[in-house]
């Protein structure tokens, strides 16, 4: 498994960079293959919205200038990663300009996967968790705004797939000068938990059976049978009336999705509960 640590700070020292160092130190101590990307050391060009926003980024999902500025190679590293830690200083309640520039270009290439020339293409963020760290030099009042900024950018880059959980956020960590010590501990624990969560058995196959049962096989060859009839018969889910609809269940990650309903209903196979 590969962790990509993406740094949006222009410094190689100070508050924000100390969290970059903590993320790398944690990954190394856990035996996680990791790499730090210091965006400030790159010379990425800003998105030029080629052809009125309908350039090769839209149709073929790479940047026409990306071979020269390093963006296309960086996007390949995003593809190869299994999880991400984004670390940014907070400037005017938003992520840093370097990180914003990178996310603008990445969003142009990834959010359009469903609409371009390759209909089977999926976002490089699909089913990959992210931790977002926002470090403020003052009291931290700008951190919520930076989180919203990052959530919107990463969520959009996750593609036009439903459910939006495909671009997952494992944790948001707000940092200031006074809480930095215990927030470093929190970051270390978050990385450990994120990879423990990632290593859980994934669904291999799901077979709907009679009486609203699902026979599930995981990728470690473990098998389980889940009975969801008590949930299905509740008043709130009365629209799901027959086994025909049940057999249309689709599988994503560890969740079952019922598309026939007006609202997409999710069942967590870990707990057997509606989400």
Model segments located where?
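Short, glycine-/small-residue-rich phosphate/pyrophosphate-handling segment
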Residues: 113-163
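Residue-level preference for short coil/turn positions at secondary-structure junctions
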Residues: 79-81, 126-127, 210, 252
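Short, solvent-exposed coil/turn elements at secondary-structure transition points
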Residues: 40-42, 136, 170, 209, ...
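Short secondary-structure boundary/capping segments
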Residues: 75-76, 121-123, 248
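A short, structured loop/turn motif at beta-sheet edges
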Residues: 28, 125, 219-223
């Amino acid at each position: 498994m590969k962790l990509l640590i993406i740094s949006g700070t222009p410094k190689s020292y100070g508050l924000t960079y100390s969290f970059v160092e903590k993320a790398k130190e944690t990954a190394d101590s856990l035996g996680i293959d990791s790499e730090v990307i210091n965006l400030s050391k790159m010379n990425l060009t800003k998105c030029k919205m080629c052809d009125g926003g309908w350039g090769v980024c839209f149709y073929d999902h790479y940047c026409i200038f990306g071979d020269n500025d390093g963006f296309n190679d960086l996007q390949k590293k995003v593809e190869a990663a299994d999880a991400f830690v984004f670390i940014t200083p907070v400037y005017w309640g938003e992520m840093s300009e370097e990180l914003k520039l990178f996310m603008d270009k990445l969003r142009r290439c990834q959010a359009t996967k469903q609409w371009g020339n390759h209909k089977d293409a999926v976002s490089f963020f699909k089913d990959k968790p992210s931790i977002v760290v926002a470090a403020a030099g003052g009291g931290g009042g700008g951190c919520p705004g930076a989180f919203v900024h990052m959530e919107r950018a990463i969520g959009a880059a996750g593609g036009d797939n439903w459910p939006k959980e495909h671009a997952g956020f494992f944790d948001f960590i707000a940092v200031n000068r006074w809480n930095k010590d215990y927030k470093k501990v929190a970051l270390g624990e978050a990385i450990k938990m994120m990879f423990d969560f990632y290593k859980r058995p994934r669904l291999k196959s799901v077979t709907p059976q009679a009486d609203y049962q699902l026979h599930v096989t995981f990728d470690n060859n473990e098998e389980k049978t889940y009975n969801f009839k008590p949930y299905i018969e509740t008043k709130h889910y009365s629209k799901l009336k027959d086994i025909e609809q049940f057999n249309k269940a689709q599988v994503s990650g560890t969740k079952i999705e019922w598309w026939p309903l007006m609202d997409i209903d999710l069942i967590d196979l870990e707990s057997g509960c509606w989400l």
